[in-house]
Amino acid sequence: ILQNLEQETGCHVLLAQKAFSMFSLYPLIGQYISGTTASGIFEARLGKEEMGKENHVFAPAYKEKDMEELVQICDHVIFNSFAQYEKYQHYFLQQECTASAGIRVNPECSTQEGHEIYDPCGPGSRLGVVKSEFPDQLPEGIEGLHFHTLCEQNADDLITTWHAFEEKFGSYLKQVKWLNLGGGHHITRADYQLDELKKLICEIRRKYNVRVYLEPGEAIALNAGYLVTEVMDIVHNGMDILILDASAACHMPDVLEMPYRPPLKDGYLPGEKPHTCRLSSMTCLAGDAVS
């Protein structure tokens, strides 16, 4: 699916390593996509060493000692603010530098109702530069723009975000070479609107003549495995509570942080069957449960 997307649209698909970093599979994954993207120096090294294709990085801020290495091992380095870019601009203006610098923008368009903790466009977000902070002319050396606003979402939300981005930042695309649409695209999900995504990418490339990148993470390995656990005991307190030898906090942190209810094999929603139970863990954290 991802290889076909690249072939039909000319886009570049990158593995977001924060979602799936089983590097033993990188040679296989690399047969179908263009490379990796990282959230810091260690992931950037991993992508360079284990896949060895296009290697991109974004972080809210960079340390000087890391930047010295990143400009050598990464093809794109994306900054979260103009102040951060100006601090390291001298690297990218050197003739021998092959890394391309970009700026992350905040389109100020939220499409994640109920998942505020994962919403980069929420009030007070630290991620990306808002339009009011943008200069009329991009600083010398900036060659691309990046936005990342989605999480496990379909193409319709990307299209909504694109319209907001284009309205605020479309004029800047004439000053750059590439546009990164970030991650959160559930491209390999059965109901994903793949044709709509292809149309959007082709339209962006035709209208603005820029290279287009996408950074799916979970979509690279969606439904590729299971968490297998054992029921150790059943306690009763208003309902049946199963004590498992697994932990939401340790093994499924998104369950507590989003919060998120993972699918259970042969499971149903509460009330759909005669018996309803809660899955909990062997840890001492009272709220370590799947609700």
Predicted regions located by residue number:
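Active-site-proximal beta-alpha core segment in soluble small-molecule metabolic enzymes
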Residues: C11-W178, Y192, L200-E203
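A short, N-terminal amphipathic alpha-helix
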Residues: L2-E8
